[in-house]
Design a protein with these regions (language model features):
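Active-site neighborhood of divalent metal-dependent phosphoester bond hydrolases
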Residues: 30, 43-136
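Active-site neighborhood of phospho(di)ester-bond hydrolases with catalytic His/Asp-centered motifs
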Residues: 6-7, 35-38, 65-69, 146, ...
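A general structural motif
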Residues: 29-31, 60-62, 141, 189-191
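Short beta-strand-to-coil "C-cap" segments at the C-terminal boundary of structured domains/repeats
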Residues: 251-254
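N-terminal active-site segment of His-dependent metallophosphoesterases
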Residues: 1-53
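Acidic, His/Gly-enriched loop-helix segments that form or flank divalent-metal centers
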Residues: 100, 108-235, 241-245
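Short amphipathic alpha-helical segments
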Residues: 17-18, 48-49, 78-79, 157, ...
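Active-site environment of divalent metal-dependent phosphoester hydrolases
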Residues: 10-14, 42-45, 71-75, 197-205, ...
Length: 254
C-alpha cells in the first residue's frame, strides 16, 4: 500500500493531480490511498473537480480527509448567507467563489439572499460529504496527519494530554502555524506530524534560515522555498499553491 499526502489544494485540481501523478499515483490502483490534510477548496477555480475526486476516493475506501479551517469557513459562509450578512473574509479568501462554483449562482444572488433555497439544496451534498468524511487527524504508522497542528498549550509549550479526544481544542489547532508550534516545543515523542495550513517557506525562512519566505519568481530556483519543511518530528507541506501554482506530495509506503 502507498499513501499519497497532499494539503491545501485550494481548488487547484490540476496542480494536485500533477503532483500525485508525478509521484507515482495511479487512480486505478486500489492500493494507492490519498490523505488530504485539509483546505481542499477556496481560492482556485476547480472546486467541483476536487470534490469529484474526493468523493471517488472516499467511495472506494481510499481517502483520509483531515478537516481544515477552510472547510469550517465554508459552513460559516453559508450561515452568513442565511443571515444575509456575509463577512468580507469570505469574499477575499474565495469561499463565496467556491459556493458560486458548486451552485452556478452569481455573486449578487448569493449575497443578496435571493436564491438561498437553491443554494442550500445544491450545497447539501458537499456539506454532507465534509461532515461524513472528515476527521480532526489521521494516523499511519509513526505519522500523524493534521491541518495546522495538534492541540497544544502556548504557555507550557506542550501538546495537550487529551489531544486525541474529540473534546480537544481542534478548532484552534486548525489555525495554528504548525512549524511555529513545533519550534516552541509542542512535539510528540517518536512521532512525525505532517501538517499544512501555513506555507512551508515560513519554516525555511524563519527557522532553518536558508531560503527566502517569498522569493521573487524571477530568481533561480525560487520554488525551493516552497518545498516541504522537514525536521525532527515535523513535515510541513503547504506549498502556498495559489502563489506557486504547485502542490507538494509526500509518499509513504507500508
Amino acid at each position: 500500500m502507498k499513501i499519497f499526502v497532499v494539503s491545501d489544494v485550494h481548488s487547484y485540481y490540476d496542480a494536485m493531480m500533477d503532483a500525485l501523478i508525478a509521484n507515482g499515483f495511479d487512480i486505478n490502483n486500489k492500493s494507492h490511498k490519498v490523505v488530504i490534510c485539509g483546505d481542499l477548496f477556496d481560492r482556485g477555480k476547480q472546486a467541483v473537480k476536487c470534490f469529484e475526486f474526493a468523493t471517488q476516493m472516499a467511495a472506494e475506501g481510499r481517502l483520509y480527509y483531515v478537516l481544515g479551517n477552510h472547510e469550517e469557513l465554508l459552513f460559516d459562509c453559508i450561515n452568513d448567507m442565511q443571515c444575509r450578512n456575509v463577512r468580507e473574509h469570505h469574499i477575499t479568501h474565495g469561499t463565496v467563489d467556491t459556493i458560486m462554483q458548486f451552485t452556478g449562482l452569481n455573486y449578487y444572488d448569493l449575497l443578496g439572499g435571493w436564491c438561498l433555497d437553491e443554494m442550500e439544496v445544491k450545497m447539501k451534498p458537499v456539506l454532507d460529504f465534509i461532515i461524513d468524511n472528515t476527521v480532526d487527524f489521521a494516523t499511519f504508522e509513526d505519522y500523524i496527519f493534521v491541518h495546522g497542528w495538534v492541540p497544544s498549550d502556548a504557555k507550557t509549550r506542550k501538546v495537550d494530554d487529551n489531544w486525541t479526544s474529540v473534546d480537544a481544542n481542534w478548532a484552534a489547532a486548525r489555525w495554528e502555524n504548525g512549524m511555529q508550534a513545533w519550534h516552541r516545543g509542542a512535539r510528540i515523542p517518536d512521532k512525525t506530524i505532517v501538517c499544512g495550513h501555513w506555507h512551508c517557506s515560513w519554516g525555511h525562512s524563519h527557522l532553518h534560515q536558508d531560503r527566502k519566505e517569498f522569493p521573487a519568481k524571477n530568481r533561480v530556483d525560487w520554488q525551493k522555498s516552497f518545498e516541504p519543511f522537514i525536521d525532527d518530528g515535523i513535515i510541513a507541506i503547504d506549498a502556498c499553491t495559489a502563489y506557486t501554482g504547485f502542490v507538494n506530495c509526500l509518499v509513504l509506503e507500508a
